[in-house]
C-alpha cells in the first residue's frame, strides 16, 4: 500500500507540474494538494513514533511534490504550512505509538492514496 502511494505521488507530481507552472493563481487541484501535504506531515510524525524506521521518507515525498509542482509564493507557503500543520497537530496529541495512532496511520495512508488516485484520474493526460 505504501509503495502504491509513493508511485501515485510521483505520477501526480509529473502530471501536475506543467499545468501548475502555467498558472499564477490557485490551481483547481490546490485544495487536494493542501490536504495531501497535511497527510504527508501527519504520516511523517506518526510513522516516526511508531518505529517504522523510514527516516525522512515522508518529508522527502513532500519535497518531491513541491519540486515537481514548483509552486511560487503563497502556494508554496500554503503547501508547507499544510505539512507542518499535519505534523504539529499529531505531535501535540501523540507522544508514543498507540493503537489509535496505528489506526490513524492506516486511515491517512488510505486517504492519501485516494487523493492521489483521484488527482491522477482527473489531471493526467
What residue ranges belong to the model's regions?
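Positively charged n-region of N-terminal signal peptides that target proteins for export
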Residues: 1-4
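Compact alpha-helical subdomains of small soluble proteins
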Residues: 25, 54-125
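Short, solvent-exposed segments of well-ordered alpha helices
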Residues: 24-34, 49, 99
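Bacterial N-terminal signal peptides
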Residues: 6-15
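Sec/Tat signal peptide C-region and signal peptidase I cleavage site
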Residues: 18-22
